[in-house]
Regions:
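Polar, low-complexity tracts enriched in small residues
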Residues: 1-264
């Protein structure tokens, strides 16, 4: 599914493990890059962090915080740190600085930038229920929304070629800085491999035989039965390309195997 993580496969199940997403992280899902948005509290906590680290650093120290593209410099001062913008205009205190953070604001400190989400509209029946997608920028989403999108992509990727039973993916579980998705594979019933021996020697020696195995080459066996390239996102066509490529490789491998047998006759 083009996701960054580790996929572990077995015959009937699998797991996909990735780093747990946090505010400010970026992730690409189905070819689109998303950024994990934050709450106002998360963003103002970043400013508090700068102030605390400045106080711990002591005399002669400064820390830079950026709010909506504007830089503010915190300078250590016994009895209370001072704050000024890039033009030298003083900011009264830390609470005044934090008051500049609104919905849609970006706050940067120490290489990390958080974007405060504006998420009032959404998928509720009243049209005003938060849906985990920023109302002004659809590329900014919550970590929970990102997990839903990842689950959907893993489900789509694992259902290519399934006919009799569809694959399912459980909700991602966070633990120890990792998020794990459990995958239950689907399947398509296919014909058994045809296997027989050709006797090529002049005597009854059992070594004078060539074993021939022919796999079924129908659409279900090739994993392309019911394959669709139609959806709103274009992802179905993307996964179809891989499925068709795998099918071509399987047919080519079977032809190669039969050609090798023919050359021995």
């Amino acid at each position: 599914a083009g996701l960054k993580g580790t996929l572990t496969d077995s015959a009937k199940s699998g797991t996909f493990v990735m780093d747990t997403l946090s505010e400010g992280d970026k992730i690409t899902i189905a070819g689109k890059e998303y950024k994990i948005g934050s709450s106002t509290t998360d963003a103002t906590n970043l400013i508090d962090k700068a102030d605390k680290e400045l106080t711990a650093a002591g005399a002669g120290s400064t820390k830079d915080v950026e709010i909506d593209g504007k830089k503010y410099t915190l300078t250590f001062k016994t009895g209370g740190n001072t704050i000024a913008d890039a033009e030298g205009n003083a900011v009264a205190d830390l609470n005044t600085l934090k008051g500049k953070v609104k919905e849609g604001s970006s706050v940067g400190y120490d290489g990390k930038t958080l974007t405060v989400m504006n998420d009032k509209l959404g998928g509720g029946t009243d049209g005003k229920t938060a849906d985990g997608i920023d109302d002004d920028d659809s590329s900014i989403i919550t970590a929970a929304r990102a997990k839903d999108l990842i689950k959907a992509e893993l489900t789509a990727a694992n259902n290519i070629g399934t006919v009799d039973e569809k694959a399912t993916v459980e909700d991602g579980v966070d633990a120890d800085g990792k998020t794990t998705f459990e995958i239950h594979k689907g399947y398509a019933t296919v014909a058994n491999t045809l296997s027989f021996n050709l006797h090529v020697g002049a005597d009854a020696d059992m070594t004078n035989k060539i074993n021939v195995e022919i796999d079924s080459m129908d659409s279900a066996s090739l994993g392309i039965k019911g394959l669709s390239i139609m959806d709103d996102s274009g992802n179905a066509a993307t996964y179809a390309v891989d499925a068709i490529s795998d099918a071509i490789s399987k047919v080519s491998s079977q032809r190669s195997s039969l050609g090798a047998v023919q050359n021995r006759l």
